[in-house]
Amino acid sequence: MKLIDLENKYKDISDRVYKKLESSGHPNYLKRFNHSLSVARKAFYLANKHYNDEVLSEKAFLAGLIHDYCKYVKENEYNKVIKDNNLNIIYDERVRSVYHGMLAPYFIRNELNINDEEILKAIEWHVTGRENMSPLEKIIYVSDILNK
């Protein structure tokens, strides 16, 4: 599948990511949205170049597109997810950037109805990385760093 085909296929998701970021009221929401598009494109490129796997390439594009979906979520929304899911986490504003990855799967499942565990894990670990990362996790981690 070509990149343009994926951009068309996931136009609705892209629009929803844009609206989520815009609704945050954060002054950098447009920059963040453009970053997400860049990460999606880079992830697609890396998956094609290093794995030549159409399924992985599509997952890489989608994961890149939504990886910062929760970047500007308010503290009370994070705390609600933590409480509602009985997570053993205490929110700390000093490490806020870690939470948008860690808690993103909960928001993405509920708001975007994306349940692919491989995609959700790649998003969960895109900030910190971890040992024994899957190919998709590595692709999203590296794509995000390359697009800072």
Predicted regions and their residues:
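Generic N-terminal amphipathic, Lys/Arg-enriched alpha-helix
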Residues: L3-N28
